[in-house]
């Protein structure tokens, strides 16, 4: 909301966010002294709002944090997935700046107590909960990345060599500390009206983070063979059910608007607080913009992010049946494969139904709204974060607010935790998966059997409930910075190397109609299947450099005559954790041993 955005702008404008010289002796997040600053609730609020500005995930993280995953095709891959492309010498995220957020939080938690004579106990506990919320999030991110990490719950004295050069604490110890912080925040952060739907940390936000982290840790432990999985999954259920049972949140779902219910959550400037629990807010009036529309529309600025066919196939039919149960489903033409499908599909990718503003006027004209290969790679062009206006596709001018936590995720967390515990039933289904599907026009009936398509994709997982939870999560939270984490916790890192197939090509060398308007739009051809005759007006011609089996570096065609983008990637199981950077090990040998599989 504007009041919070105004306060953030004021804090930034006054340069209250200090630059830091050293991780261990830096100034706190604000240029102030504790003797005079922490003497009122206003001081606590100001400091807490500063955390929102400095710690909240950025627009880039929220909208494209999942671009290097199995369900997004990019022009290039990251070094981490290249053969020989990543090592301890190249590793990062252990420098002073990476630990600075922890110092700032611990400084705040230590010195905020100076406000106790001026602030009532409930308010003090609320703001302590805010600090512990951010510390929990910080450490969860560090554990996801490195596994064992040193735990610090106070700012470090620069003369304390024992603390400066301590070793890494075990994952279990650190995560128990994280859970303590989460429990405190979820208990003592306030749910008073002045904190709710004002985009600040409150009890519901704390419960949302607890739900997310506990699901991650519970399933990580289950699939990576560690003890304690059930404890974490039950903590996820407890947090999710508290939020589901005692909060003002629900799904954005209006009867008769199934084709737009989903997209409303992502395309509006004012956060959709019916569903959104916390957002990174943007606002045109305050000149607060991001670049998501530009990134996804530009072939040079972005990575030409696109959806792979294997993912598009996961979307159900509106009658609740599986698209992939139909014989030849993988050979369905683009113009036909969206009819009668989950309406989230057309709200996530450009389809023949897509309408956007071009030159200030809304149009569905195919040549104007559908991009060529210069801006995407598979012809499943992502529009989830786009404002559907070409005025925002060549600059940083998007002002749609971006959800950080939303109620839909809580339903998904509850469903998956219950499924992993073996406790999914019709009651749980009807409270979680069913409403998510029904708001986008899909009949929400429970599955009678496990989906063989998903069982094959997820390498033999046969539990029908777990498979449906994974389907729903991948669709509902697509490109919301959750997929990479999901693959890591499910021990499915090898899916990062899946084939990146695109649309089905009816016949090489022959133009075809993409959108069903009776006009040919596109023609793929190759050396062995050349285009026939002269080029047709209005048809884009794309050369496929070879067919399946040939040594190619760009595009191929697979056995189902689907376009395939060639992108070499490599996975090894030691990559479930990143290496501790070599320079950090050299400075502090007590951080050894290095994570398994990585050389120093």
Question: Where are the language model's segments positioned?
Answer:
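Sec-dependent bacterial lipoprotein signal peptides
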Residues: 1-18
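Long, intrinsically disordered, low-complexity segments
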Residues: 20, 98-101, 177-179, 258, ...
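An aromatic- and glycine-enriched ligand-binding surface/loop that stacks and positions planar moieties
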Residues: 21-79, 149, 175, 182-184, ...
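Conserved, well-structured interaction surfaces
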Residues: 41-46, 50-55, 78-146, 162-176, ...
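Flexible, polar/acidic helix-loop-strand segments at domain edges
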Residues: 332-407, 595-599
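Active/binding-pocket-proximal capping segment
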Residues: 408-412, 424-453
């Amino acid at each position: 909301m504007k009041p919070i955005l105004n306060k953030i702008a004021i804090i930034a404008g006054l340069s209250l966010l200090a630059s830091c010289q050293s991780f261990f002796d830096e100034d706190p997040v604000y240029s102030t002294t504790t003797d005079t600053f922490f003497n009122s609730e206003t001081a606590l609020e100001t400091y807490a709002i500063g955390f929102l500005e400095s710690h909240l995930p950025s627009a880039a993280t929220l909208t494209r944090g999942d671009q290097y995953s199995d369900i997004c095709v990019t022009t290039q891959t990251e070094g981490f997935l290249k053969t020989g492309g990543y090592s301890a010498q190249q590793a990062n995220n252990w420098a002073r700046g990476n630990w600075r957020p922890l110092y700032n939080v611990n400084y705040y938690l230590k010195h905020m107590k100076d406000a106790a004579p001026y602030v009532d106990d409930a308010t003090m506990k609320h703001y302590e909960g805010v600090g512990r919320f951010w510390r929990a999030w910080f450490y969860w991110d560090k554990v996801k990345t490195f596994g064992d990490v040193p735990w610090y719950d106070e700012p470090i004295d620069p003369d304390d060599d024992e603390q400066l050069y301590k070793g890494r604490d075990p994952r279990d110890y650190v995560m128990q500390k994280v859970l303590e912080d989460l429990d405190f925040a979820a208990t003592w952060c306030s749910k008073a009206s002045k904190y709710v739907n004002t985009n600040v940390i409150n009890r519901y936000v704390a419960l949302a983070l607890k739900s997310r982290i506990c699901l991650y840790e519970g399933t990580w432990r289950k699939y990576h063979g560690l003890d304690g999985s059930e404890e974490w999954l039950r903590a996820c259920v407890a947090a999710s059910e508290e939020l589901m049972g005692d909060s003002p949140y629900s799904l954005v779902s209006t009867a008769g608007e199934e084709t737009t219910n989903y997209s409303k959550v992502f395309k509006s400037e004012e956060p959709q607080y019916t569903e959104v629990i916390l957002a990174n807010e943007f606002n045109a009036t305050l000149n607060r913009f991001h670049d998501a529309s530009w990134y996804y529309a530009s072939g040079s600025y972005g990575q030409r992010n696109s959806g792979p066919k294997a993912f598009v196939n996961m979307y159900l039919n509106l009658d609740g049946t599986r698209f992939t149960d139909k014989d030849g489903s993988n050979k369905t033409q683009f113009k036909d494969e969206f009819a009668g499908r989950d309406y989230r599909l057309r709200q996530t990718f450009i389809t023949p139904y897509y309408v956007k503003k071009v030159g200030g006027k809304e149009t569905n004209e195919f040549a104007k709204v559908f991009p060529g290969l210069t801006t995407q790679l598979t012809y499943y062009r992502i529009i989830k974060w786009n404002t559907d206006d070409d005025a925002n596709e060549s600059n940083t001018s998007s002002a749609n607010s971006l959800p950080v936590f939303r109620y839909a995720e809580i339903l998904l967390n509850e469903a998956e935790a219950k499924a992993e515990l073996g406790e999914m039933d019709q009651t749980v289904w009807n409270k979680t998966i069913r409403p998510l599907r029904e708001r986008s026009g899909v009949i929400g009936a429970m599955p009678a059997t496990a989906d063989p398509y998903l069982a094959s994709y997820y390498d033999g997982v046969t539990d029908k409930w777990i498979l449906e939870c994974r389907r729903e999560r991948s669709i509902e939270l697509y490109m919301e910075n959750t997929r990479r984490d999901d693959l890591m916790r499910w021990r499915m890192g090898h899916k990062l190397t899946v084939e990146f197939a695109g649309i089905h090509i009816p016949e090489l060398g022959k133009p075809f109609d993409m959108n069903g308007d009776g006009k040919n739009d596109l023609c793929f051809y190759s050396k062995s299947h050349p285009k026939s005759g002269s080029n047709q007006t209005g048809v884009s011609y794309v050369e496929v450099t070879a067919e399946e089996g040939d040594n190619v570096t760009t595009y191929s065609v697979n056995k189902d005559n689907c376009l395939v983008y060639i992108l070499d990637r490599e996975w090894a199981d030691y990559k479930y954790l990143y290496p501790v950077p070599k320079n950090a090990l050299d400075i502090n040998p007590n951080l050894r041993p290095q994570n398994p599989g990585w050389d120093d």
